[in-house]
């Protein structure tokens, strides 16, 4: 069973359908007992960082996620950004699960970064075109396992311990997106 954290901001239905299409049972929850029973936890998200953190703190999700060390915790789009320490969007602290910060995209290309872009990585699964929609990005770091070139390097997939971030929308990225999501649900792209 996969637990999708429902904190009130997210593309829950599309992510749910994608995970079910992969053959997993899904539960939408904010309940610690459900999360503890799950094989993996997914934190989806669209919208504003500050609003998302307010909702997460209101529902006591932050401490629950900080105590998960034995299974994948996957953030998608805004969910990936929430995993980090701080965001310039609203100048607010994140979940502080992954070292680093979220900053505005600095590119000569149009913002938001919208549409298909190729991932670059040494991991063979992470070398495909995927669908992005965002104006903020994680800073480049040693935790980036795939990035896209958009006039600057845009982290597309990060992994730090059991925390995996996917900046693009795997549920909107066709077969490759589903394969990437499935690999994340199984534990990610690096071996510790």
From Swiss-Prot:
<feature type="active site">
    <location>
        <position position="171"/>
    </location>
</feature>
<keyword id="KW-0378">Hydrolase</keyword>
<comment type="pathway">
    <text>Amino-acid biosynthesis; L-histidine biosynthesis; L-histidine from 5-phospho-alpha-D-ribose 1-diphosphate: step 5/9.</text>
</comment>
<comment type="subunit">
    <text>Heterodimer of HisH and HisF.</text>
</comment>
<dbReference type="GO" id="GO:0005737">
    <property type="term" value="C:cytoplasm"/>
</dbReference>
<keyword id="KW-0963">Cytoplasm</keyword>
<dbReference type="Pfam" id="PF00117">
    <property type="entry name" value="GATase"/>
</dbReference>
<comment type="function">
    <text>IGPS catalyzes the conversion of PRFAR and glutamine to IGP, AICAR and glutamate. The HisH subunit catalyzes the hydrolysis of glutamine to glutamate and ammonia as part of the synthesis of IGP and AICAR. The resulting ammonia molecule is channeled to the active site of HisF.</text>
</comment>
<feature type="active site">
    <location>
        <position position="169"/>
    </location>
</feature>
<dbReference type="InterPro" id="IPR017926">
    <property type="entry name" value="GATASE"/>
</dbReference>
<feature type="domain" description="Glutamine amidotransferase type-1">
    <location>
        <begin position="1"/>
        <end position="192"/>
    </location>
</feature>
<keyword id="KW-0028">Amino-acid biosynthesis</keyword>
<dbReference type="GO" id="GO:0000107">
    <property type="term" value="F:imidazoleglycerol-phosphate synthase activity"/>
</dbReference>
<dbReference type="GO" id="GO:0000105">
    <property type="term" value="P:L-histidine biosynthetic process"/>
</dbReference>
<keyword id="KW-0368">Histidine biosynthesis</keyword>
<keyword id="KW-0315">Glutamine amidotransferase</keyword>
<dbReference type="InterPro" id="IPR010139">
    <property type="entry name" value="Imidazole-glycPsynth_HisH"/>
</dbReference>
<dbReference type="GO" id="GO:0004359">
    <property type="term" value="F:glutaminase activity"/>
</dbReference>
<dbReference type="InterPro" id="IPR029062">
    <property type="entry name" value="Class_I_gatase-like"/>
</dbReference>
<feature type="active site" description="Nucleophile">
    <location>
        <position position="77"/>
    </location>
</feature>
<protein>
    <recommendedName>
        <fullName>Imidazole glycerol phosphate synthase subunit HisH</fullName>
        <ecNumber>4.3.2.10</ecNumber>
        <ecNumber>3.5.1.2</ecNumber>
    </recommendedName>
</protein>
<keyword id="KW-0456">Lyase</keyword>
<dbReference type="GO" id="GO:0016829">
    <property type="term" value="F:lyase activity"/>
</dbReference>
């Amino acid at each position: 069973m996969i637990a999708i954290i429902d904190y009130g901001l997210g593309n829950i239905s599309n992510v749910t359908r994608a995970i079910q299409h992969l053959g997993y049972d899904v539960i939408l929850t904010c309940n610690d007992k459900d999360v503890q029973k799950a094989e993996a936890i997914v934190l989806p998200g669209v919208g504003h960082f500050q609003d998302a953190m307010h909702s997460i703190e209101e529902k006591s999700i932050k401490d629950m996620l900080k105590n998960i060390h034995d299974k994948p915790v996957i953030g998608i789009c805004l969910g990936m950004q929430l995993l980090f320490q701080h965001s310039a969007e609203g100048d607010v602290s994140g979940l502080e699960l992954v070292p680093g910060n979220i900053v505005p995209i600095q590119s000569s290309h149009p913002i938001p970064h919208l549409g298909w872009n190729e991932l670059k990585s040494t991991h063979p699964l992470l070398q495909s075109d995927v669908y992005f929609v965002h104006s903020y990005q994680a800073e480049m770091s040693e935790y980036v396992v795939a990035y896209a070139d958009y006039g600057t390097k845009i982290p597309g997939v990060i992994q730090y311990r059991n925390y995996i971030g996917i900046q693009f929308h795997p549920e909107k990225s066709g077969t490759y997106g589903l394969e990437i999501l499935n690999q994340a649900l199984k534990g990610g792209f690096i071996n510790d």
